[in-house]
């Protein structure tokens, strides 16, 4: 058997990767007809609903003297504002015991 010769098994089936001299012409798919509209009408679109809906207003977004992100705005927790300087007193006394 010479180098580069076929050793049986027929021709390679990798023609789809590297191109083939024996390409089979493909028939184009038939065009898809558009779907006809139903005789009873169509549903309304989102544009119609936008005008009907009232704007949503948050009932807990009101003016505060300290600013909007203070107090129990969303989480019903006290403010997280830093109250001591770096290296100063710790607010973790309840964990480690006040000294």
UniProtKB/Swiss-Prot annotation:
PTM-bearing positions, type Phosphoserine: 58
The keyword Phosphoprotein belongs to this UniProt entry's keyword annotation: yes
Biased composition (Pro residues): 27-39
Alphabetical GO biological process terms: cortical microtubule organization
Record carries keyword Amino-acid biosynthesis: no
GO cellular component: microtubule
Region entry Disordered, spans: 1-99
Compositionally biased tracts (Gly residues): 1-12
Tissue expression from the record: Expressed exclusively in stems and flowers.
InterPro entries listed in its UniProt record: SPR1/2/3/4/5 (IPR039613)
Biased composition annotated in UniProt, kind: Polar residues: 56-73
Domain of life: Eukaryota
Keyword set, alphabetical order: Microtubule, Phosphoprotein
Membership in a protein family: Belongs to the SPIRAL1 family.
Biological role stated in the UniProt entry: Acts redundantly with SPR1 in maintaining the cortical microtubules organization essential for anisotropic cell growth.
Name of this protein: Protein SPIRAL1-like 5
Organism: Arabidopsis thaliana (Mouse-ear cress)
